[in-house]
Amino acid sequence: MSLIEQLNWRYATKRMNNAKVPVEKVDKIKEAIRLAPTSFGLQGFKVFEIEDAALRQRIYNEACQQPQILEGSNILVFAAYKKITAELVDEYMQNTAKTRNIPVESLDGFRAAFDGAVAGSEEQNFLWNAKQTYIALGTGLIAAAEEQVDATPIEGFNPAALDEILGLSPQNLGSVTILVLGYRDTVEDKYAAASKVRKSTEDLYVKL
């Protein structure tokens, strides 16, 4: 299928059939998320893979008991850094220098510009990083569609409770969104055969 056909195929699956997604497909989706663009390339977030059944149940209880949490194959929790610390920036600069085989000192000017761009309160840092997670989330949704894997993004959960469950606060992290991977239950999910509702091209785009 073409990209547009894949995007027409996908939808926010409400019920899944408990079938496991092959590891190679999950790995491709994860790699797409890793390669997603972010501002400065910082990737100011972590992605937690929930494999423990007890953790999954606790997340389900704090996520409005949405059935996909229990019925899906894979659960990914996106958590953004609350504060862009000097340590995070040091790691980023070292990784850049190593990857591009250049002296880290050659990045001093870039670092100064970077430090100025991300200067701000913890709230501002978290909101900025949270926005970046949505770019990665969207990339993951497209990659899942390409692999014919259903994917449901979830924001309906108690962030404070999820942070506590996963021990995020001591790691300078806060939960942002959840991505469930799996396969649609065409019997139980009434939306599986429903037509996709979107604005028309004319309504969405404004030419100036």
Task: Enumerate the predicted regions with their spans.
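Acidic, surface-exposed loops and disordered segments
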Residues: 1-208
